[in-house]
């Protein structure tokens, strides 16, 4: 369904890089991390090809009853063979998805690479009627 998931966040001097890693792993498990020091901040990236990579998002979207909102953000971030969404870093650390990426610490960016974005969106965040998936 997807080829790769990449997650990226900027880590500022006031932040603990291990906590940012935890926030990222709370959304996408099995990430392999790399850090790039840019002086004033670190760019932390994690990548995975694990088949279970999107299972946690799948569960969070349903558990938080945000399928319609998630679908809207997935469609908005759909570009060719990539779907890009941005989520709040602090909410992710708490194990919650919040699409309000406005934060002084910056968002966590999730890039899903897929040859079939429509199928992926239909699985991850199907359209609903009265909160019940209809796809």
Swiss-Prot record:
Domain of life: Archaea
Position of the signal peptide: none
Database matches in Pfam families: RNA_binding
Family, per entry: Belongs to the UPF0201 family.
NCBIfam families to which the protein is assigned, alphabetical: PRK00447.1
Name assigned to this protein: UPF0201 protein TON_1346
